[in-house]
């Protein structure tokens, strides 16, 4: 009987211990401590087929090498469920820092909160992510303004334009807002079509083709990123309108640089982003948080510059 009683007591203690341990890792438990140093970095990108995110991956590797850390880059393929699973995997792997370009800035919040409870620093890049410790992104309103200002300038302040929109994330909404800010200041300009692409060249081609079919009297097209803008270029050339329609984008990608240098292209300008710099700054901000020096502002905006045919040879690029 003593042996049985002792066994029951041991099992009871084990059960209580297991329950307490589970409680500490639940949503209601105390958060784990922040890391002492950054040794493992998890980078989460929206769509690796976009050269923008390849450049971001390169920046992550460079930033990690400087501090002796490792990186693990995950491609969401524009799927929120993938990003939720990737964050849970990073928690299990014990990463110290997650740098995320969120597919859905609100939908990803519960997963970010799980990561933070596990003691992981989370920095959003390119677009905000609710719950992140900070966000580093291009001044997207400024980028949209610069690109559309140049487009309208090239049209002489008069004409019909199309907007090639994208997925509904903050940075893309901001670029469209920037463009519309400029349109409102130019009464000779009219937006006659706006459709959302999937942020890539193929869908940029498809939606621009649809809009040009519906409204062929167009003089300019703004693509909210370079892949969609270059898709618009293909659509313009397919209808043999390269001589009368001009196109601008946002990114300053290597592909857009090549297009600016191509003779006869309707592509005339792009507002820059610096994806590698976003990640470098994310690592610096995370280190500051570890050192007890969080950023004064949790949203850090990187200025955008305009690149045209006239200035492309001076542009450093990605």
Regions found by a protein language model. Name each.
Residues 2-7, 12-13, 17, 23-318:
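A residue-level marker of the well-folded mature domains of exported/periplasmic proteins
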């Amino acid at each position: 009987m003593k042996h049985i009683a002792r066994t029951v007591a041991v099992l009871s203690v084990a059960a209580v211990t297991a329950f307490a341990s589970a409680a500490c890792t639940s949503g209601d438990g105390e958060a784990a401590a922040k890391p002492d140093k950054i040794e493992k970095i998890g980078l989460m990108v929206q769509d690796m087929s976009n050269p923008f995110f390849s450049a971001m991956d390169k920046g992550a590797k460079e930033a990690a090498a400087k501090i002796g850390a490792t990186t693990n880059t995950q491609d969401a393929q524009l799927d929120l469920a993938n990003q939720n699973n990737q964050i849970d995997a990073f928690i299990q792997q014990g990463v110290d820092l997650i740098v995320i370009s969120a597919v859905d800035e609100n939908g990803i919040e519960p997963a970010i909160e799980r990561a933070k409870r596990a003691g992981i620093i989370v920095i959003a890049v390119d677009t905000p992510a609710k719950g992140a410790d900070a966000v580093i992104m291009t001044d997207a309103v400024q980028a949209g303004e610069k690109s559309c200002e140049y487009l309208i300038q090239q049209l002489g302040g008069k004409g019909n334009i199309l907007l090639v929109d994208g997925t509904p994330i903050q940075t893309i909404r901001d670029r469209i807002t920037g463009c519309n800010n400029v349109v409102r200041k130019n009464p000779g300009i009219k937006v006659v079509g706006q459709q959302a692409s999937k942020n890539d060249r193929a869908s940029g081609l498809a939606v621009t083709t649809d809009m040009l079919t519906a409204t062929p009297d167009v003089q300019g097209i703004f693509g909210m990123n370079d892949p969609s803008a270059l898709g618009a270029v293909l659509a313009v050339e397919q209808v043999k309108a390269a001589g009368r329609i001009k196109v601008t984008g946002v990114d300053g990608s290597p592909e857009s640089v090549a297009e600016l240098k191509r003779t006869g292209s309707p592509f005339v300008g792009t507002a820059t982003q610096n994806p590698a710099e976003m990640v470098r700054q994310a690592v610096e901000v995370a280190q500051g948080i570890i050192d007890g020096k969080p950023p004064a502002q949790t949203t850090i905006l990187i200025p955008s510059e305009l690149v045209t045919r006239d200035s492309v040879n001076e542009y450093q690029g990605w």
